[in-house]
């Protein structure tokens, strides 16, 4: 797997201060994607053990709330295979930090159902993620007023609660004063 960018102090892609990893490779090709350069699986630099260690070091400070995975597409099967061992390390070393993941795949229909995104790593990778922002970016549904989403069709899902209940459970941002607009 390659990655296009790492941000060690990101406040735009999840709650609080985050370390964000932008992986390379995406087959969605959303119209007006903010990161279309990362569609190419060969874009950027190789994701190595040194990269993992640098990210783990960046997660150490107490002010860092967690890790965000973006792309490209973290749930392309080849990316899942590279990310799963890393996410296990993050969970082991930082059990109190949260993991957010942005994906164009739908949680209930494609990641939990049958689709090209499913592979031997999918269920375990989902079990390590706290919050999933799912759904392709749709330019016609774009709004700058959305918290942590680009378009109104995207959902912010509490993965742990959704897996426990078998139903989609929205992540609770409203109770913490973050306005969310839903149609």
Residue positions per predicted region:
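Hydrophobic adenine-recognition pocket in adenosine-nucleotide-binding enzymes
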Residues: 26
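P-loop/Walker A phosphate-binding loop and immediately adjacent motor/lid segment at beta-alpha junctions
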Residues: 86-91, 142-183
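Conserved Radical SAM active-site core
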Residues: 1-4, 17, 35-101, 105-115, ...
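Glycine-rich nucleotide phosphate-binding loop and flanking beta-alpha elements
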Residues: 75, 139-140
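Receiver (REC) domain switch/active-site residues of two-component response regulators
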Residues: 130
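Short, conserved loop/helix-junction motifs that constitute active-site signature segments
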Residues: 124-127, 150
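N-terminal [4Fe-4S]-dependent radical SAM core
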Residues: 1-22, 31, 35-42, 168-169, ...
């Amino acid at each position: 797997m390659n990655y296009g960018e790492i941000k060690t102090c990101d406040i735009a892609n999840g709650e609080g201060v985050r370390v964000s990893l932008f992986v390379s490779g995406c087959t969605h090709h959303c119209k007006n994607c903010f990161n279309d350069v990362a569609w190419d699986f060969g874009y950027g630099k190789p994701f190595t053990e040194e990269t993992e260690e640098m990210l783990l070091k960046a997660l150490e400070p107490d002010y860092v709330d967690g890790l965000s995975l973006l792309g490209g597409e973290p749930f392309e099967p080849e990316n899942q295979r590279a990310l799963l061992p890393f996410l296990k390390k993050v969970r082991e070393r930082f059990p109190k930090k949260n993991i957010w993941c942005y994906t164009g795949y739908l949680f209930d229909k494609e990641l939990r159902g049958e689709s090209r995104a499913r592979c031997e790593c999918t269920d375990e990778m989902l079990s390590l993620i706290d919050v999933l922002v799912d759904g392709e970016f749709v330019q016609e549904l774009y709004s700058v007023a959305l918290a942590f989403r680009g378009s109104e069709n995207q959902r912010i899902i509490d993965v742990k609660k959704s897996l426990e209940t078998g139903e989609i459970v929205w992540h609770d941002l409203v109770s913490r004063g973050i306005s969310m607009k839903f149609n």
